[in-house]
């Protein structure tokens, strides 16, 4: 399997990984997966329930297993959970088996996008913005180190982000003739 067969989206919650991932999959004729949705489908419960019963560590174990499995596939676009990059094993799977795209948004922007979303256990706190700032400070260096491509989501529409991504991916395609997300 070529490193260029798959596209993996990373970034904090609310960055647009699922939305942009679906568009990339459609554009390139790939199958789309969302690691959080896969976990929910396999367990039959929502992510907050897993956090409540198993804690974050239990959820991360499930996430690691799903990512290990999905990264063996070819011709996919995968939207990962925001904390997936905390696992060295996940980082290795992503780095080795595809192109990693970091959708980078400011904590303030992401807080605005997620303010009414109750399906994000880490933000069910008295100060979600402070939590997002903490997560950004912790994870941004990891995302940047892992990413082959970074797109700033600030003040960009989804259409604008995807246009930027298509351009960047087309440039990579020119540099690496093996790039073919559709397999």
Curated annotation (Swiss-Prot):
UniProt keywords, alphabetically: Amino-acid biosynthesis, Aromatic amino acid biosynthesis, ATP-binding, Cytoplasm, Kinase, Magnesium, Metal-binding, Nucleotide-binding, Transferase
Example of a GO biological process term: aromatic amino acid family biosynthetic process
Cofactor annotation comment: Binds 1 Mg(2+) ion per subunit.
Residues binding Mg(2+): 18
One example GO MF annotation: ATP binding
Primary location recorded for the protein, binned into one broad class: cytoplasm
Keyword Metal-binding: yes
Pathway(s) it belongs to: Metabolic intermediate biosynthesis; chorismate biosynthesis; chorismate from D-erythrose 4-phosphate and phosphoenolpyruvate: step 5/7
Cofactor: Mg(2+)
Catalyzed reaction equations: shikimate + ATP = 3-phosphoshikimate + ADP + H(+)
Annotated signal sequence range: none
Binding site for ATP: 14-19, 120, 156
Example of a GO cellular component annotation carried by this entry: cytosol
Family: Belongs to the shikimate kinase family.
Protein's name according to its UniProt entry: Shikimate kinase
UniProt organism field: Thiobacillus denitrificans (strain ATCC 25259 / T1)
